[in-house]
Amino acid sequence: MDYRIEKDTLGEVKVPFNVYWGPQTERSRKNFKIGPESSMPIEIIYGFAILKKAAAYTNHELGVLEIKKRDLIGKVCDEIIDGKLDDQFPLVIWQTGSGTQTNMNVNEVISNRAHVLLGNKLGEGEVFVKANDDANKSQSSNDTFPTAMYIACYKKIIEVTIPGISKLIQSIKQKSKEFESIIKIGRTHLMDATPITLGQEFSGYYSQLEYGVKSLKNSLPHLSEIALGGTAVGTGLNTPKGYSELVAKYISKFSGISFVSAKNKFEALAAHDAIVESHGALKQLAICLNKIANDIRMMASGPRSGIGELIIPSNEPGSSIMPGKVNPTQCEALTMVCGQVIGNDTAISFGGAQGHYELNVFKPLMSSNLLISARLIGDACQSFAENCINGIKANKKKINQFLNDSLMLITALNTKIGYYKAAEIANKAFSEDITLKEAAISLNYLTPKEFDDWVDPKNMI
């Protein structure tokens, strides 16, 4: 027989004989065959393990859970955190919006794994650690899932996203320093403008990213406020006195991150503005990164029929039909990531608006999208730094050609001969395809020496 019979409040359920999950997990596995199996992010499962262990220690300290059960729950949770039980969490994102089935998946795994650790066989005899009464003691799905997702999202941001962005910032800063003396023509509206150094242009990029990281870091305090202790609707029903504050301390201890009990549990259950806020910062970074990637690939366009001011690394052949073609693939990958993050933000915004009365029921959607975005931005920034920015070179020949040919150098004459005479020189140079100097001299507005003294790109930056 390849299954065992387990019971829940709705009756008997056939559960695969060799798995640690139980009847409620199996019901969900059968009822929600939507998308890939096991799509619930494993980071959320690890967040659950941290909070379940913290709850067990808190419950014991407050006198409502015996030490043997505390230690068994803690041991199983450590196994989960270490990745030893990853295959025991088969549920999908697309389930109940409170994440109840995933909460019960974790509870059942804790219960049955503890049963085996005590020397018993799955499905035989009464379990010592009960899924609802012990693993879920002083808890509700309504306060555990938001706590698990905040732990997961916070960890992903500080462990993956911020380090990736920081690496890219440093790479761009190094290039800005390297390019600080290279004068090029600036562009506004995609048209020629006044001169700028390539280093100044790159300084704008890393400054944008620094503001984005600042926004992301500023969102973390809200994300550190956990709902655990609010139980079903925020009142804390069925929790011992002092539970909320103590469990937050244990979560901080076991996660290595400072978490605090949410000031208002009703807000913590019914709204997830912390997710909206943090992902808003990720969207800000995506918008910034999209601008940077587009600028770089346009400046690298060519190599002979485009702008060609930058030379980007030749990482791989670019065409199956055109020999020798190399494409700005890192820029393309990064802009696709940006599009995905901006799309995820739309879903999160919609999900954040679905807090009806005392509970938001879009928790799996919101948390999974943030985890995806946080990972994508962190990974993409690191890849872009290593495989594009670090290898960029300036094409000084092209840069000088465009600089010297630009009509917008005439702007330097505004304070010498006035805007209208300067415009007349520029228009004549353009219409007759001659240089600015030739046009200025032919109009008798300047001497050759005056032009050379006044129209000098080095004095315009």
Question: Each PLM stretch: what is its role?
Answer:
Residues 1-461:
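Conserved, well-structured ligand/cofactor-binding cores
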